[in-house]
Amino acid sequence: ANLVIENATQPSTYKTEAYYLAAQAHYRLHQYPQTIAQLQLYLEQSNIAESTNKTMALYLHAYALFNQKDFAAAEPIFRQYTAAMSNNTANTTYADALNRIGDCLFQARDFQQASDVYHQVAALKSNGADYAILQQGYAQGLLHHYAEKAEVLTSLIEQYPRSDYADDAMYEIARAQLQQDKNEDAIHTYQQLLKKYPNSNQAPKSSLELGMAYRTTKQYDAAIESFKSTIEHYAGTEEAYAALEGLEQVYVESNKIDEYIAYTKTLNRMKMQSATSEDSLVYVTAELQYMLGNYAQAAAGLTTYLTRFCPGGRHCTNATYYAANSYYQLKQYDQAIEQYSALADIQGNPYMEEACMRVAELSYDKQEYRTALYYFQRMQEVASSSNHRLTAMIG
């Protein structure tokens, strides 16, 4: 990009636009300081008023600052952009810029102003409206306006039932209901979430908190059933360990400790009682090798951990993810597929979408089209981003 600018001396318009194009190139490479530097040169040109890109340059500049987490500097530039676009509010970038203004205010903990801006976006009913409603709900919760939070998030589910954020909204509605001591309403909401979104990242927390809500209302049999479901469906997660602790407390409170002891004996290899020092030592040692990029040593150590401590170990989900990535980096694709497939079977884990994508792509490359199709379909079910959902749809 710099070479283009050096040679773009005549006419000056070319040089001006070259600065802008260079800024775009740096931005796509996530080189945000260089993006800002090129935009400053672009804006300093004497013929800037003639440029057709000067408005979009504001948008690019604001995003470069935003992506560096300089929210205080990004906000006024996003505001300049929305002012310049005030006659074209149907443009999707207008609503997007408003959302980023809301995010900047949210990061500054100005939750009321953030909520007001998100409300503006929601009223536009443009792209990003569902995100705006979710964020407005979060802001209302942080203002301790729990009834308003539940009302706002309910509108998200009603207006955008297929939104990527519908499960997040439902989870936060349940939490708002608990804050208002509406335990039975929260129980119903958690049940609906687990039924409708069993693979959601919110499912393990919802399952655990459902058990806790049952316990609070002294519905001990239902609490026991819910805690056991969490332990069995989300083995190896922090929620499973918390559920075991909750289960123990329920059995103690209902004077059924013998039943608890009998249940723990059925867990077999699921070493749920506590994370032993050996468990953590083996995992942390292997994890360090992964973080250092020593993938062969990491794969060996993580495989050892998975064999010795899983499915009930405290770090099984992360260990499976790191092992899969290690084999992928080593181009040992059969082993990578094995680990990614195992990861895809751990319900509610945050890596499920990526795991399905990797198995689908690797199977496709091996011309194992039936397997690839299966995982592309699974990925479409759990996809949390529009880009990945598009990948899943086109296979």
Give residue spans per PLM region.
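Acidic, polar-rich low-complexity tracts and alpha-helical solenoid repeat scaffolds
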Residues: 1-395
